[in-house]
């Protein structure tokens, strides 16, 4: 705002209305709805999404270990652990896990053991520490070439795994092969538009309170004063589409729509095809991921469908009946889930600048601990 005037902030959203018809949830611009929800949370409840502090920041642990060794020259293992593990950010890291990391670093030449038993930066570690980018904790984005046959379509900064779908150059693509060494992603064209599949960097979290407010916005008929006429119309269109699918009302039941099962008050199960259902639990990222894995544990082919980084729903591909899916959701609500028993794919990890120097066992442990929240899932399902 000008001096003496009222400050004003405007949010603009672009949506291509000429896209071909798709499932109702793929036609909604959820970032717009989430923006409405977050404005309401702040203006009416004075609530903003809290920062999530990871419990097991192993990439940062590597960085601080190398920084300390570089500054000290050589340090006894006990002294190193005593200093590093007393830093507040590492209070959840066990001595056993730190010992595992140090052994891995020794095996890979990042650090070496001196004649007196002290640890010092190794030959390979010197290359990392002396690089000017080492001063930055965060990674410098890498570009991956996206190719369809022999033609380069463009570049992305995310190494999408095989079968992942994403949008680029105005079209949708599915990954057929990933070459990390050459930084190439081979794809095939698919119809429609795509949002990234459930595998992502693990760094973008949406809070469950935000998702519940999104559900509230969809259920409401209120016209918000901060929306202009075009935005009001767009929100009403999205509300109407969701209600037609029985997503946001509890009284609509048809042959294609399943109302909430007993003990499952969170959202709706919508049958898209005879073998495809969508579950709308309105859970935050970490809770929604936990629900996806628990459904997989129970034999359902589940994937979180993301709009950008917003966990809109879980797509369930199965030959099993709607009643079986509803029963499973009711049981999950009643009994919860043990995230430490989930079968996590080997390529799943929370992105970190120094993940290449971290044992796979620790990266998996970090993913389970910091990217899955079974308690929040059960509490808010």
Model-assigned labels for residue ranges:
Residues 1-53:
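Conserved segment of the helicase C-terminal RecA-like domain
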Residues 10-12, 119, 183-188, 277-280, 301-323, 338-344:
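A generic structural motif
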Residues 4-8, 12, 129, 141, ...:
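Terminal, basic amphipathic appendages of nucleotide-handling enzymes
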Residues 3-6, 29-36, 59-62, 77, ...:
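Amphipathic alpha-helical transducer elements in NTP-driven molecular machines
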Residues 249-260, 280-302:
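Short amphipathic alpha-helix segments
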Residues 286-292, 319-328:
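Short, conserved charged micro-motifs
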Residues 46-161, 165-172, 177-178, 271-281, ...:
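C-terminal accessory/connector segments of nucleic-acid motor ATPases
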């Amino acid at each position: 705002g000008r001096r003496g005037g009222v400050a004003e902030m405007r949010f603009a959203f672009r949506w291509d209305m000429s896209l071909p018809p798709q499932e109702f949830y793929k036609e909604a611009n959820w970032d717009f709805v989430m923006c409405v929800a977050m404005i309401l949370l702040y203006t009416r409840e004075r609530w903003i999404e809290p920062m999530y502090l990871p419990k097991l920041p192993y990439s940062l642990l590597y960085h601080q270990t190398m920084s300390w060794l570089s500054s000290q020259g050589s340090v006894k293992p006990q002294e190193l652990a005593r200093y590093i593990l007393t830093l507040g950010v590492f209070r959840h890291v066990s001595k056993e896990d730190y010992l595992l990391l140090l052994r891995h670093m020794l095996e890979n030449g990042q650090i070496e053991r001196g004649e007196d038993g002290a640890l010092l930066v190794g030959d390979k570690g010197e290359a990392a520490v002396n690089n000017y980018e080492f001063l930055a904790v965060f990674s410098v984005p890498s570009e991956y070439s996206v190719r369809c046959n022999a033609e380069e379509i463009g570049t992305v900064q995310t190494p999408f795994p095989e079968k992942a779908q994403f949008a680029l150059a105005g079209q949708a693509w599915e990954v057929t092969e990933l070459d990390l060494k050459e930084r190439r992603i081979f794809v095939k064209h698919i119809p429609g538009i795509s949002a990234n599949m459930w595998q992502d960097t693990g760094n973008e979290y949406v809070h469950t309170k935000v998702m519940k407010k999104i559900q509230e916005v969809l259920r409401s008929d209120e016209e918000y004063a901060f929306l202009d006429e075009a935005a009001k119309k767009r929100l009403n269109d999205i509300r109407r589409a969701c209600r037609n699918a029985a997503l946001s009302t509890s009284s609509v039941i048809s042959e294609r729509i399943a109302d909430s099962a007993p003990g499952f008050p969170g959202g709706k199960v919508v049958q898209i095809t005879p073998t495809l259902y969508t579950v709308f639990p309105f859970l935050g990222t970490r809770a929604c991921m936990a629900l996806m894995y628990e459904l997989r544990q129970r034999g359902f082919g589940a994937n979180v469908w993301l709009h950008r980084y917003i966990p809109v729903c879980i797509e369930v591909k199965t030959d099993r009946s709607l009643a079986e899916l509803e029963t499973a959701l009711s049981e999950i609500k009643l009994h919860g889930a043990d995230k430490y028993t989930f079968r996590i794919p080997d390529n799943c990890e929370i992105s970190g600048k120094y993940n290449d120097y971290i044992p796979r066992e620790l990266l998996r442990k970090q993913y389970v601990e910091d990217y899955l929240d079974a308690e929040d899932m059960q509490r808010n399902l």
